[in-house]
UniProtKB/Swiss-Prot annotation:
Cleaved propeptide residues: 27-110
GO molecular function: serine-type endopeptidase activity
BP terms from Gene Ontology: acrosome reaction; binding of sperm to zona pellucida; fertilization; protein processing; reproductive process; sperm capacitation
Signal peptide start-end: 1-26
InterPro entries in the cross-refs: Galactose-bd-like_sf, Kexin/furin, P_dom, Peptidase_S8/S53_dom, Peptidase_S8/S53_dom_sf, Peptidase_S8_Asp-AS, Peptidase_S8_His-AS, Peptidase_S8_Ser-AS
PANTHER family: PROPROTEIN CONVERTASE SUBTILISIN/KEXIN-RELATED, PROPROTEIN CONVERTASE SUBTILISIN_KEXIN TYPE 4
Post-translational modification: N-glycosylated. Synthesized in the endoplasmic reticulum as a zymogen, is matured by autocatalytic cleavage between the prodomain and the catalytic domain.
Subunit and partners: The proPCSK4 form interacts with HSPA5; the interaction takes place at the endoplasmic reticulum.
Observed effect of gene inactivation: Knockout males show impaired fertility. Sperm from mutants exhibit accelerated capacitation, precocious acrosome reaction, reduced binding to egg zona pellucida, and impaired fertilizing ability. They have abnormal acrosome formation during spermatogenesis. Sperm proteins are hyper-tyrosine phosphorylated during capacitation. In females, the percent of successful mating is comparable to that of their PCSK4 +/- female littermates, however the average litter size of the former is half that of the latter.
Similarity remark: Belongs to the peptidase S8 family. Furin subfamily.
Annotated active site: 155 (charge relay system), 196 (charge relay system), 370 (charge relay system)
Name by which UniProt lists this protein: Proprotein convertase subtilisin/kexin type 4
Length: 655
């Protein structure tokens, strides 16, 4: 019997209602039974609070006595509405400085699924099989293999007993924040969905010359893994992962982020932002932790990594991808926050990255920007071995200088105000490990970071179809009129605006030296009418430029003719240093202290000198105090010595 018209209408109405609920639940925050709470008097106060309101105190979020992780067993594990009762109770307690009920955060691994390709027995991206590779062999031939450096892979766990990983595995650099135990071993499933972290780990630190798989870029570095993507992901989980053992771990590598769907605008929560800040200010005994991030795989959806608050943070070093042929991969996101590029693959016939895989296996199928970030992390480990005193900002300066346009193909290569080529696809180009370690050895410490905030718009202003907002910057100086910033590093634009179709709005910024950087290009799939709420865009394209002069923000409607919007707030944020960085040599230089070197190699690098710690301008130095003394007394003579700094080694000898 055919259903009546009324039954059809009822069925259709019910279906639409269910779809609406599903859509709403996908868009709305999902609250969980965990709270982050900041109290005034540490652990005892957190315990009192937990007992008073029926929480379980799961301990500190950061290694101090302020932020705590509380869970309530009487609250639903997942809900579309916050628990207002506990919210009111915590709000009324005078000892609670801040609290937040946690929500699930959608994070995706930045790998790609491709059909089976033939096995590639050679690692073409670092063994000179192609003319312009990552120049890893040059660093290895100088005896640099990552020894003494610790890297942690923040992902879905690593197979710690893998034949190519166990010798370098570091339990202190590992933890499981999904199950809260010390074992980061991945959860095995029929389709091996949790292979991502193990693959990233092998790129960095797979053991060399053991007759298995290939060699990691830094094959003597210690490697750890944090299991944090295989379960409920909250701000607490992310913050704790990024704060694990900050005095032990030198580099955190992350190949994940918000969805690369061309619609999402999302970034770290308050706790994760605090974890980044603490990492760069307190990590590595104050030198600053290195956070290496994959730029994203949303190219097919015209996504832009400046809509990802992890890759566009000033505290992370964002890495893009190129193919063996030097082309832009189909998944690559073009954005102004990318620093540098390493290899991955493009179409399915392209050679991919060789690395470790689950079940004690090897693979030649690792790809996406997920594969690019760990290669960069390994190269930075080589630089840290060459010079352990480098700060997080030193490394960013070095990466800018050690990246080469090489053979990379793109239509948007431009020369910025200080003569460097830069691209939204590749940043400053393909990272060169040999050049990176050469520069690291002779790098003088970067002077302190300065910040200049200029509020440009603070009253509602209608957005025209094409709108330019000029601002002449002359006030980046202190009370004595000394210039705070002479050379730029990061430039941020903080915006609050409404727009009828967000993805149709292109935003760009032009510097006083004429460099135009696209902060966000059109995103056709982003039909949101929410605009940008206090969102921060970032560009690396003005590195070392002089900030003084006319800055111009541009907003242009690239889509529907009748789009309308309002600009509520615009602040220009300039970061940099008082030093004129353009006066520094752009390549390694041998100074007048060259006589302190006892023996040099064929390339003129010092091999025999005063101490096994590091070389500065062709000279080995014993301590950070000696480093700073030489920096302050450049004309003083130095006594010669005879100890070896970095004797050359082959991978076979160093394995």
């Amino acid at each position: 019997m055919r259903p009546s018209q009324t039954e059809l209408w009822l069925g259709l109405t019910l279906t639409l209602a269910l779809l609406a609920v599903r859509w709403a639940s996908a868009q709305a925050p999902i609250y969980v039974s965990s709270w982050a709470v900041r109290v005034t008097k540490g652990y005892q106060e957190a315990e009192r609070l937990a007992r008073k309101f029926g929480f379980v105190n799961l301990g500190q979020i950061f290694p101090d006595d302020q932020y705590f992780h509380l869970r309530h067993r009487g609250v639903a594990q997942q809900s579309l509405t916050p628990h207002w009762g506990h919210r009111l109770r915590l709000k009324k307690d005078p000892k609670v400085r801040w609290f937040e009920q946690q929500t699930l955060r959608r994070r995706v691994k930045r790998s790609l699924v491709v059909p089976t390709d033939p096995w590639f027995s050679k690692q073409w991206y670092m063994n000179k099989e192609i003319q312009q590779d990552l120049n890893i062999l040059k660093a290895w031939n100088q005896g640099l293999t990552g020894r003494g450096v610790v890297i942690s892979i923040l992902d879905d766990g690593i197979e710690k007993d893998h034949p190519d990983l166990w010798a370098n595995y570091d339990p202190l650099a590992s933890y499981d924040f999904n199950d809260y135990d010390p074992d980061p071993q991945p959860r095995y499933t029929p389709n091996d969905e949790n292979r991502h972290g193990t693959r990233c780990a092998g790129e960095v630190s797979a053991t060399a010359n053991n007759g298995f798989c290939g060699a990691g870029v830094a094959f003597n570095a210690r490697i750890g893994g944090v299991r944090m993507l295989d379960g409920a992901i909250t701000d607490i989980v992310e913050a704790q992962s990024l704060s694990l053992q900050p005095q032990h771990i030198h580099i955190y590598s992350a190949s994940w982020g918000p969805e690369d769907d061309g619609r999402t605008v999302d970034g770290p929560g308050l706790l994760t932002q605090e974890a980044f800040r603490r990492g760069v200010t307190k990590g590595r005994q104050g030198l600053g932790t290195l956070f290496i991030w994959a730029s994203g795989n949303g190219g097919l959806h015209y996504d832009n990594c400046n809509c990802d608050g992890y890759t566009n943070s000033i505290h992370t070093l964002s890495v893009g991808s190129t193919t063996r042929q030097g082309r832009v991969p189909w998944y690559s996101e073009a954005c102004a926050s990318t620093f540098t590029t390493t290899f991955s693959s493009g179409v399915v016939t392209d050679p991919q990255i060789v690395t470790t895989d689950l079940h004690h296996q090897c693979t030649d199928k690792h790809t996406g920007t997920s594969a690019s970030a760990p290669l960069a992390a390994g190269m930075i480990a080589l630089a840290l071995e060459a010079n352990p005193l480098l700060t997080w900002r030193d490394l960013q300066h070095l990466v800018v200088r050690a990246s080469r346009p090489a053979q990379l193909q793109a239509e948007d290569w431009r020369i910025n105000g200080v003569g460097r080529q830069v691209s939204h696809h590749y940043g400053y180009g393909l990272l060169d490990a040999g050049l990176l370690v050469d520069l690291a050895r002779v790098w003088l410490p970067t002077k302190p970071q300065k910040k200049c905030a200029i509020r440009v718009v603070h009253t509602p202003t209608p957005i025209l179809p094409r709108m330019l907002v000029p601002k002449n910057v002359t006030a980046c100086s202190d009370g004595s009129r000394r210039r705070l910033i002479r050379s730029l590093e990061h430039v941020q634009v903080q915006l609050s605006l409404s727009y009828s179709r967000r993805g149709d709005l292109e935003i760009f910024l032009t510097s006083p030296m004429g460099t135009r950087s696209t902060l966000v290009a059109i995103r056709p799939l982003d039909i949101s009418g929410q605009g940008y709420n206090n969102w921060i865009f970032m560009s690396t394209h003005y590195w070392d430029e002089d900030p003084q002069g006319l800055w111009t923000l541009g907003l242009e409607n690239k889509g529907y003719y009748f789009n309308t919007g309002t600009l509520y707030y615009y602040t220009l944020l300039l970061y940099g240093t008082a030093e004129d960085m353009t006066a520094r040599p752009q390549a390694p230089q041998v100074t007048s202290r060259a006589r302190a070197c006892v023996q040099r190699d064929t390339e003129g690098l010092c091999q025999e000198s005063h101490s096994p710690l590091s070389i500065l301008a062709g000279l080995c130095l014993i301590s950070s105090q000696q480093w700073w003394w030489l920096y302050s007394h450049p004309q003083q003579p130095v006594t010669e010595g005879q100890a070896s700094c970095h004797p050359p080694v082959t991978p076979a000898a160093a394995a």
